[in-house]
Structures are given as structure tokens and as C-alpha cells.
Amino acid sequence: MTGSQSSAQTVAVFTSDVQDAIDSMQQLQTDVDGLRGDVESEVGYSVDKINSLLKRIHELNGTVASATGLGKNIGGAADQRMSAIEELSGLISVNVRDQPDGRVTIETVNGAVLLDKKLRQLSYANGGASASQPTYPNIDIRFAEDSGAMGAATGEKLDSAAVGGKLGGLLDLRDRALPAFSEQMGVLFSGLSEALNAVSNAGSTVPPPASLDGRQTGLVGSDRLGFTGAATFAVTKADGTLVAKTSIDFGAMPANATIDDMVTAINAGLGGGATASFTDGKLSIKANGAGNGVVVAQNEANPSARAGVGVSQYFGLNDMVRSDSNSLVPSGLAAGDAHGFATGETAQIVLRDATGRALTSYTLSPATGGTVGDLVSELNASPLGDFGDFSLDDRGRMRFEPTGALSGATLSIPSDSTDRFGTGRGFTAMLGLTGASSGLENAQVRPEVLASPGKLPLARFQENAVVGAKALGAGDTRGATAFVDKLASTLDLGKDGKTTIERFSSLLLGRAGLEASQANDNLLDAAARRDDAVNRRDSFSGVNIDEELAQMVILQNSYSAAARVISTASEMYDTLLNMV
């Protein structure tokens, strides 16, 4: 992409590679959702099997207790019960205790009773529906009739990987491992899209586009402008000759300046060369005059910035990557800004510990006319605030810092009906509390950029150019080097710290591979311990083949000796008869 004869092909390969990367991330997200659906089906099957085994063990308990009371042999029923318990222990970790009457009681490792003299069954409202869902119901323990018909709840539940066994592993996958991977994939996409768009918005195509049409920001014209630094808005001819320009120093504007004030300043500065408008949360600038185009450039000495990104990138005027569900930049909202949500709109927030167990949840209910700071206060005063602190960082992102004892705790937002001033942007997308709201699901490289390499903005505006002089050059590909440099630079990923795209992706995929390897090792270790326990049990209470073989040899020798004695006695008897 540096001006060689093959630069168009190189640009085409680059844009195609970016789209392929986005497609791969989207496919991974789809695969994760599919896996969660498969795991959910297995959860349902496992619950049904556990219930069947508990019922079987309960029936055999009665048989063994009755036979014990009558002094009868219990071997057959006890062996069947042991087989059922062994199968149950593979599905869930249990503690089994023998009782004086011959029965056994069964508890989970956390002490929840599954079986004593009264049968209990697991109640799972979801029934193992084979679809990925934002949240899943708890598995409740209920008293049950001998027939298996469920009654009242015991008040105990199975809700995390701590239950152990196959069921615990499934819950860990469904509620922790897979959602965490998906959330981190969203963070990776956020960093990638912000880096790519930072470079594309700093450049321009030659000829420049007749209009720059921004994406949805979630803002309205009366919102605080919030920019520092300066930017240049210009109009050029198709060959890059400057027609008009205006430099806006945001720092010199009043402290209470609004987005509408910026639009007014742009229009006044360009003197009819172009028309800017801000409608329904989107900024657009359209050149006036046939063949003219629009350029927005950063001031090199004092670049414009809100939430750490320039004015063109913030409004998405020249993005390379777009998403219909996210603005792809931090909001830049401050505590005193209006949150823009209406009474009756809500967002459900769930907090889970490092094992995936839901600790608590809260439904955020903003009041009309409130501020972003009010949202922070409401969350800190909620049950969620008992487990950590909410705050707003300098880029307008909501942050949650769990208490030290809850390291690894995560938040999720299963449902969100909020809508900031009717723009279609809600609490989740505006404040970026989790990476799951990154907009990855419908992101893409702009179709016109994919279709035509010349639509990728690689040229840089000559800030000191005067009207009538060349401000853009057709052979200028400085943006190509900028893409390389930006993708290799350190990025601010919010709660996930500052790192490079390469390092973050390597850690993410490496962590997934490591967890898979550890899970396999744990499986092998558990299988070895199980086999050892079974062998020791069988040696103690079952048939030891070596010992029995030795006994048979002794018996055979005894039989042979007895046979010889009998044979000798027979011969003596015959001799006596002959003597008579």
C-alpha cells in the first residue's frame, strides 16, 4: 500500500484480510453460541439421568433395608445400588454415608441433601432447551414422591461448577468459560475496529467523497460537545485543489458548547462550500458544487479528541469498519451529562463469581431527566455495589471493580430496553460495561471500501495549503504506514488494560488452548483416581481373582489328597475281603 504498481492489489488484499478477520471472529461467536446450546442440552439430559438414578437408589434402599431387617442376603440389591451410585458420582460429586438400617444417604459436596429416607429430585425449568440464552434458570432440589412426582422445594439448588462431575463441568462451560471467551472476543474486536478507524478517519481518498456521512453516536444536538484540540474541515476539487477550509479550535469554544454549536461553526467557516448537519444522532457534511469533495483532518500539533479519539472518528465520518449496533468508540460522556433514558426503560445486570455462579442481579431503572452520574450512584447503592464499585473512566466507559475477595467476577447484561433520546443506543452500547456489547455480531468493512481499493483513505490533507493550492495528492499513501504502526501500537482496552492487538489475541487464544489442555489433564487424572478407587473397593468388598485362584489351588490339592486316601482305603478293604 505504499505507491507501487501493485498498491491497488495490496490494498484489496489488506481490506479483504480485515474482513476475513472480522468474519473469523463472528464465526467464533457463532460457534460459542452453538456450543452453549449443545451444553445446555447436555445439562438437561444430565439432570434427567441424575433424577433417574436417585429414584433407582431410593428404591434399592428400601429393598436393602427390608432384607437387612429380616436377616436376608442383600448382595444382589446392594451391588445394583453400588453400580447406580458409581454412575451418579460421575454425573455429580457426592458424599455417600451408610446407615445402620442398610440404607445410604447422599449429599452434594456442598452439603445439599439428595437422598435420605425421603426421595428428592432436581427441577430444571429450562428442560435442556438446545439454544444459547442470556441467562439460565437454577437447578432446584425438590422433595419427591416414591413415583418421582415432585413436590415442594427444599430451598437448596445447584448453580455452579462446584457441584462437580459432568454436570459441574457443563455448568462451568455454559456459565463461565464460553461467555468469558465471547466477551473477550468482543473486547478484541473493539480494539481492532478502533485502531483501524483511527487511521482511516485521519486520511482521505483522492478524489475525496462528495459527502461524509457519520454513523449513529447516541447523542443529540443539545449534548455537550466535549472536544479538546483542533480539527480542519475542508472542501477540495476532485484533483485535490483546495476550495475552502476552516479550522475549529474546540478548546477556544465555550465550556458549555454543544454539538449544534460545532455544526454552526463548521457551516460558518466553510462559507457555503459545504453543509454540515446533525440529525438523529448522525453527523453529515456534504460538499456544495459539482465534483467537489469533503475532507476532515486532525491538527497535527493539537489534534482534536473526545474519549481519546478525533472528531472524524468519533462521528464515524470516514470509518473503515462499521457496525449497526455500536458506535465503535467510547461515549465520552461525563457524570454531569444527561443519561437520556426514560422512566420505565430498564437494563438487567447479573454479577457472577469466578466459577460462573450468579451472586446477585439488579435491574437498572433510570428516571427521566437524570444524569450519567445518577446511574453510577444507583448501581453502587444496589446489591451489586456490595461486591464492588462502579465508576466512570475518562473515556466515558462504565467500570466495575470487584472487591479483592471476588477476583475474576464478571458482569453480564441479559436484557436492555433503554434507548438514549430515541437514537437506538442503549445503556449497554453507550457505556461499554462489557465486551459483549461491542457490535461484533453485525460488523463489517464498509462495502464500498471492499469493492474498490481506491475508497480506502490513505492520503493526508496538507494542513498549510491555501485556497487554490493542492491539499491532497493522488500518490499520497502515508496512511498505509499509519495502519501498520497503529495495529502494532498499544491500545486502551478499558478494564482489560493497555496492550497491543497481537498480544491480546495471543493471550486470548492461548488461554483458551491452555484451559482445554488443563481440562483434558484433569479428566485423565480423575479417570485414574476413579479406576484406582474402584480397584481398591473391589479388592475389599468384591472378588479378588488372585486370592480366589490360590484358594482353588489349595482346594484342588486337598481334593487330590483326599482322593488318594480314599483310594488307599479301598485297596485295604479289598485286601481284607480277600483274606476272609
Question: Model-predicted segments: where are they?
Answer:
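Structural signature of extracellular appendage/secretion-system components
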Residues: 1-580
